[in-house]
């Protein structure tokens, strides 16, 4: 440690380092060693929930707990403290005549934030709080910095996102939200595993961005001296596995898109993609509904859920509507009759729909109508299906009306939560779609993809009829934890240095 660093320490930090040195001089390792616990705070509270003070005294049961010291009070020969572990907090009752002089000195000199182990009798105070009456204290690790202000938790938003460790220590609500996230993902896995899906892993580094319309991050592989991109989707590799005969696969993993950031978008995020051979988009609709309802029930219980004051009937069958019907219902514009691009553009101008240079077909304009007018009306869970071919380069055409695809998106609270379709397995059609995307890219569409000839070749070996699905894990977690910003469900959101 340099002198310059020591000079920058504040008074509290200096005192804590002095205590660290004092512990070492007493033969106590300031940063401890392994420690065996018999219970955590939640287990004790559950086990003894219905026991009175007198009953606990009669039982005379002991427990060994460990955690971070969050509060400490008292003077003389008696003290109280709260110890925090992963499940919550439990009160400590420490008497000098119970732990001995040396042990009590450890307690007196302990700072908030220190980790200690405690062995003692399970009791209830006169105020009715379940506590541990300590008989032995063990110093486990020294905290060299003071914790955030103890009564109000960490409230500075910038610090919450940059120093998530402090947020987790200080804010139980935040801690529980991330526990819920983990449980949600585990339940999704459990649901799919129960349906005989196989979890797989595919590359993060790709030679060509594909599987979605998004701008990629570009990096360089030094050993091979080639530019590569971080994946914007797992789709094309997973479909290669369907070609290979795996039939039912899914991957939960990180996706990277070099795009804007807002309340629902982070450049690095988690998605799940699922592919099922011999299925179509209607089968995948049912699968999607099952996944989301199973996850919601696991973390929020039966019945509807509240999201920011709106009751979401997530437990009921999801509404299903064709995109063209949804547009007609909201705007009156009818795209069912065949029309020219010029007629569609005129209709868009009449309704003041913003037009981009790469809108070169009726399909692009239909999609623009939907995004401009319909999305904001979709509050309850709604499957919107029948997207135009032009905005669905990997989806199979609807056999009854080839202007549209057998694709759907799930909307809840006006946001997209899932995207799925009957997969395109015709390699000739796939190449044609890729070429159309390449043309759009040349016209300025930064999100259009290039041509993945290797994937087209894989399709030429034959892929069975397949349904595929993608769900944004972070956005689903926001819904199920009643959170308004994606940063609150990402442990370490992207931040400027």
Swiss-Prot record:
Protein's UniProt keywords contain NAD: no
EC number: 6.1.1.6
Compartment(s) where it occurs, according to its Swiss-Prot or TrEMBL record: Cytoplasm
One MF term in the entry's GO annotations: tRNA binding
Keywords, ordered alphabetically: Aminoacyl-tRNA synthetase, ATP-binding, Cytoplasm, Ligase, Magnesium, Metal-binding, Nucleotide-binding, Protein biosynthesis
Residues that coordinate or bind Mg(2+) 2: 416
GO cellular component labels: cytosol
Statement: the UniProt record of this protein carries the keyword Metal-binding: yes
Gene3D superfamilies, per the entry: Bira Bifunctional Protein, Domain 2 (3.30.930.10), Nucleic acid-binding proteins (2.40.50.140)
Cofactor: Mg(2+)
Catalytic activity entry: tRNA(Lys) + L-lysine + ATP = L-lysyl-tRNA(Lys) + AMP + diphosphate
Cofactor annotation remark: Binds 3 Mg(2+) ions per subunit.
NCBIfam families for this protein: lysS_bact (TIGR00499), PRK00484.1 (NF001756)
Similarity comment: family membership: Belongs to the class-II aminoacyl-tRNA synthetase family.
HAMAP family per the UniProt record, alphabetical: Lys_tRNA_synth_class2
Protein name: Lysine--tRNA ligase
């Amino acid at each position: 440690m340099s002198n310059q660093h020591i000079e920058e320490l504040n008074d509290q930090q200096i005192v804590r380092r002095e205590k660290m040195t004092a512990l070492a001089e007493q033969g106590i390792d300031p940063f401890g060693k392994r420690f065996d616990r018999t219970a955590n705070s939640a287990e004790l509270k559950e086990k003894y929930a219905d026991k009175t003070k007198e009953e606990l005294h009669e039982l005379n049961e002991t427990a060994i707990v460990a955690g971070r010291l969050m509060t400490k009070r008292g003077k003389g020969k008696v003290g109280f403290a709260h110890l925090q572990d992963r499940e919550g907090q439990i009160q400590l009752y420490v008497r000098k005549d119970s732990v001995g002089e040396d042990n009590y000195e450890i307690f007196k000199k302990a700072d908030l934030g220190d980790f200690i182990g405690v062995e003692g009798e399970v009791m209830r105070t006169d105020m009715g709080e379940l506590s541990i009456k300590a008989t032995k204290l063990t110093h486990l690790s020294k905290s060299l910095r003071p914790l955030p202000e103890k009564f109000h938790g960490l409230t500075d938003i910038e610090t919450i996102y940059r120093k998530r460790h402090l947020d987790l220590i200080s804010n139980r609500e935040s801690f529980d939200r991330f526990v819920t996230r983990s449980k949600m993902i585990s339940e999704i896995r459990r649901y799919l595993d129960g349906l005989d899906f196989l979890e797989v892993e595919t590359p993060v580094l790709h030679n060509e961005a594909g599987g979605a319309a998004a701008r990629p991050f570009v990096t360089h592989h030094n050993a091979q001296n080639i530019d590569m991109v971080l994946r914007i989707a797992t789709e094309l590799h997973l479909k290669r596995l369907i070609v290979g005969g795996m039939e039912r696969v899914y991957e939960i993993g990180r996706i990277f898109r070099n795009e804007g950031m807002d309340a629902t978008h982070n450049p690095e995020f988690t998605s799940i993609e699922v592919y099922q051979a011999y299925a179509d988009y209607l089968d995948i609709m049912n699968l999607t509904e099952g996944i989301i309802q199973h996850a919601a029930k696991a973390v929020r219980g039966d019945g509807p859920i509240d999201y920011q004051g709106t009751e979401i009937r997530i437990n009921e069958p999801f509404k299903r509507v064709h995109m063209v019907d949804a547009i007609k219902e909201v705007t009156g514009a009818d795209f069912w009759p065949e029309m020219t691009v010029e007629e569609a553009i005129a209709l868009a101008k009449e309704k003041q729909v913003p037009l981009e240079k790469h809108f070169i077909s009726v399909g692009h304009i239909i999609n623009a109508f939907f995004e401009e007018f319909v999305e904001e009306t979709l509050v309850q869970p709604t499957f919107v299906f029948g997207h135009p071919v032009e905005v669905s380069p990997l989806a199979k055409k609807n056999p009854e009306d080839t202007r549209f695809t057998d694709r759907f998106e799930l909307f809840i609270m006006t946001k997209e939560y899932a995207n799925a379709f009957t997969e395109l397995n015709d390699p000739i059609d796939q190449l044609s779609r890729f070429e159309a995307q390449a043309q759009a890219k040349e016209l300025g569409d930064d999100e259009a993809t290039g041509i993945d000839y290797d994937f087209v070749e894989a399709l030429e070996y034959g892929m069975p009829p397949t349904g595929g699905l993608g769900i944004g894990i972070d956005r689903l977690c926001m819904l199920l934890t009643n959170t308004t910003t994606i940063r609150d469900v990402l442990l370490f959101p992207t931040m400027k240095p």
